[in-house]
Amino acid sequence: MTEHVQIKTAKWDSGEMEYFRFGRGKETLVIVPGLSVQSVMRSADAVAQAYKALTDDYTIYVFDRRKDLPAAYSVRDMAEDTASAFRALGLGQVNLFGASQGGMISMEIAVRCPELVKKLVLGSTSACVTEGQFALIEKWIQLAEDGDAAALYSAFGEALYPEALYNAARELLIELAKSVTDEELRRFVVMAKALKGFHITDELAKISCPVLVIGDEDDRVLGAEASREIADRMGGRPGVELYMYDGCGHAAYDTAPDYKERIARFLSGQAALE
């Protein structure tokens, strides 16, 4: 049985950020999650269980966004704060996995703080959020601003998960929505608005560490081409791999049964495409 995971706080001169840690391996794996209605800190035990197979080889850290979110907060701001949290904990040369918005944050860190990143895994993310992609996110923002947590959870889940899985989880999502606070909705709006105009495509060539890009053909949030574009912009250099699932949805990082194994193979130097 997975041991109960404790939530801790990383502190630096200008901010604080919650995180949790599990595993006992010599290597460090840091996970930066995507945009969510409620913090991943609420699901710490479930995350630890999901990554249990990696805990012998890795000590795993999962970071939230900073505690006191300002009204205007860009993805680059998020990356700067996350890097500050790394440094506050003495983390460097980490294996970094970012999913969705977390992938955008991770790309920013890899570009601006290359000394912090040993290997990079990017899941269901994009180097450039287009107006078409942001149109969906804008609908989520409106639901959050209206205070309609049930509709937000429903719309969010429908976009992230394959239809069958969403239909099976619909009642659970409605139940989860009952616990959403006004502050959680405010934070969601700030984080979602940060996606507008995000663009790091022209800087991807600066990333020199090994990179695994994982996408899904049925990604209804950012689209399958977003993952291909990232891999293409890396210049086809050695050390860059692209793997595309089909039918797992945007949240393939949760739904694909071999996702964690694929990450582990890449980090250990094996081909993730096998």
Q: What is the meaning of each model-derived region?
A:
Residues 131-133, 151-198, 202-203:
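Conserved alpha/beta-hydrolase catalytic His-Asp/Glu region
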Residues 225-251:
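Catalytic histidine neighborhood in serine/cysteine hydrolases
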Residues 9-69:
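Conserved HGGG/HGGXW glycine-rich cap/lid loop of the alpha/beta-hydrolase fold
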Residues 111, 118-147:
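Flexible "cap/lid" loop of the alpha/beta hydrolase fold
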Residues 77-94:
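Conserved acidic catalytic loop of the alpha/beta-hydrolase fold
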Residues 248-260:
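Catalytic histidine-centered segment of alpha/beta-hydrolase-like enzymes
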Residues 98-102, 106:
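Gly/Ala-rich beta-loop-alpha elbow adjacent to hydrolase catalytic centers
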Residues 207, 213-215, 219:
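Short beta-strand/loop motif that positions the catalytic acidic residue
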